[in-house]
């Protein structure tokens, strides 16, 4: 009888673990399970990493709040990884909280351990501290390269809509901007711009999350922007989001986002 009871409770435990695993898998955008990666950190111990980074995002402000990471070559993926979101779970060090955190890829980590491992995340100091138990952030930051579990998840920026930050070199003949805070996939397959009185024009991804269009004649606003997500192929249109009197370096917020 004792042996039967033991097997019964073992099966219950296995079933509970399976349910938890399936729940985590359902949050992924590509259906893959948890993988293993190396983790380091950079910048100030409580800071948001680099300002802007290779992706050009404003990393310290809401909704990112410094919970960001640079990605090694496989994660950054020549800029395609900009804006994608990952959960990271640390449980191999005594200071680990064993609770997952979510980070957004905002920068590139091209060398050192980032390039020597199949997957690597170089977290901001703030994000690294968030992996730790209360009061153990400094201990975890001084641990060197950590082994963690990671999984791709959908981005979810609550109460935040997609924003367009104009490139410093943008002008009426050359319109370029960074697309920020997309829910869902976090990366885009297509970006199209529609000037006043015109039709939608395909834009080119110049670098990372920056999209551009070169025009033989000046384009005038207000502009509509149509976005297509890379994996789910969902489409949203931000109407009149960039005004006629737009300026370089300014950020224009839409009233839409992917669900």
Swiss-Prot record:
Q: Where, subcellularly, is it found?
A: Secreted, Cell wall; Membrane
The protein's UniProt keywords, in alphabetical order, are: Cell wall, Disulfide bond, Glycoprotein, Membrane, Secreted, Signal
Disulfide connectivity for this sequence is: 55-82, 85-155, 90-96
Q: What does this protein do?
A: May cause loosening and extension of plant cell walls by disrupting non-covalent bonding between cellulose microfibrils and matrix glucans.
Keyword Glycoprotein included in the entry's annotation: yes
Q: List the carbohydrate attachment sites.
A: 26, 249
Q: Which first-to-last residue range defines the signal peptide?
A: 1-24
Q: Which domain of life is it from?
A: Eukaryota
User: Could you tell me the membrane topology recorded for this protein?
Assistant: Peripheral membrane protein
The terms describing its cellular component in GO are: extracellular region; membrane
Which terms does the UniProt entry file under GO BP? anatomical structure morphogenesis; plant-type cell wall loosening; sexual reproduction
- Keyword Disulfide bond assigned to the entry: answer is yes
User: Which Pfam families does the UniProt entry name for this protein?
Assistant: DPBB_1, Expansin_C
InterPro entries named among the record's database cross-references: Expan_Lol_pI (IPR007118), Expansin/allergen_DPBB_dom (IPR007112), Expansin_CBD (IPR007117), Expansin_CBD_sf (IPR036749), LolPI (IPR005795), RlpA-like_DPBB (IPR009009), RlpA-like_sf (IPR036908)
Every copy of the Expansin-like EG45 domain together lies at: 52-160
The gene designation is EXPB6
Name the UniProt record assigns to this protein: Expansin-B6
Give the record's family classification: Belongs to the expansin family. Expansin B subfamily.
Q: Which residues form the Expansin-like CBD domain?
A: 173-254
């Amino acid at each position: 009888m004792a042996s039967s009871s033991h097997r019964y409770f073992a099966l219950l435990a296995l079933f509970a673990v399976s349910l938890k695993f399936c729940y985590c898998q359902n949050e992924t955008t590509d259906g893959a399970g948890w993988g293993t990666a190396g983790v380091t950190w950079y910048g100030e111990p409580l800071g948001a990493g680099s300002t802007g980074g290779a992706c050009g995002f404003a990393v310290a402000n809401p909704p990112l709040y410094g919970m960001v990471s640079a990605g090694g070559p496989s994660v950054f993926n020549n800029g395609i990884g900009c804006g994608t979101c990952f959960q990271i779970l640390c449980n191999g060090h005594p200071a680990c909280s064993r609770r997952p955190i979510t980070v957004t890829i905002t920068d590139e980590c091209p060398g050192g351990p980032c390039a020597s491992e199949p997957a690597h995340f170089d977290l901001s100091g703030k994000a690294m501290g968030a992996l730790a138990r209360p009061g153990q952030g400094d201990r975890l930051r001084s641990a060197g390269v950590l082994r963690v579990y990671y999984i791709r998840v959908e981005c979810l920026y609550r109460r935040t809509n997609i924003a367009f930050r104009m490139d410093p070199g943008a002008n009426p003949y050359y319109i370029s901007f960074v697309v920020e805070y997309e829910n869902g996939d976090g990366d885009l397959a297509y970006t199209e711009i529609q000037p006043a009185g015109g039709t939608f024009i395909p834009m080119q991804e110049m670098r990372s999350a920056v999209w551009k269009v070169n025009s033989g004649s000046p384009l005038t606003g207000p502009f509509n922007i149509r976005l297509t997500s890379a994996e789910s192929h969902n489409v949203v249109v931000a109407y009149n989001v960039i005004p006629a009197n737009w300026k370089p370096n300014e950020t224009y917020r839409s009233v839409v986002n992917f669900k």
